[in-house]
Amino acid sequence: MARTKHRVTRSQPRNQTDAAGASSSQAAGPTTTPTRRGGEGGDNTQQTNPTTSPATGTRRGAKRSRQAMPRGSQKKSYRYRPGTVALKEIRHFQKQTNLLIPAASFIREVRSITHMLAPPQINRWTAEALVALQEAAEDYLVGLFSDSMLCAIHARRVTLMRKDFELARRLGGKGRPW
């Protein structure tokens, strides 16, 4: 193929055999070293360092090396739009029925509160009582978060703030007010 001053734009090949043939025919020039006779090498052409075209001043060769590789080997990592993963997690956790607070840390906290508030003789809990207490605590927290979210939406915000929790506790009559 003769060198021309202006580069001809070509349409993309339809299948991979055309892509390999088109990249080798485009690559025949000063930037490649063919290993077969006549420059018909398909996959056996060797790329050298990309050079700068004197007419346009653009780099050639880097784009060709990307086109020569099969498309299946370059896996682009998919990035979800902001908020999609959060909604997916919300749906996932709403479907679950198990407890979300780790049992060991919850039991440790219950024992420390019992040690601070109860007399020294009372320091033992049955397993059923701890499970019931954990279920009640998680139910209370879920209700508090949902009421707080309603307060934030009422204030035309999406972000939960401390004042939303305070207002939800005051309006719900749960717990002591600040």
From Swiss-Prot:
It holds the Pfam family Histone. It comes from the Eukaryota. The keyword Acetylation applies. Residues 16-36 have a biased composition (Low complexity). Keywords: Acetylation, Centromere, Chromosome, DNA-binding, Kinetochore, Methylation, Nucleosome core, Phosphoprotein. Residues 43-56 have a biased composition (Polar residues). This is Histone H3-like centromeric protein CENH3. The lineage of its organism: Eukaryota, Viridiplantae, Streptophyta, Embryophyta, Tracheophyta. The gene is CENH3.
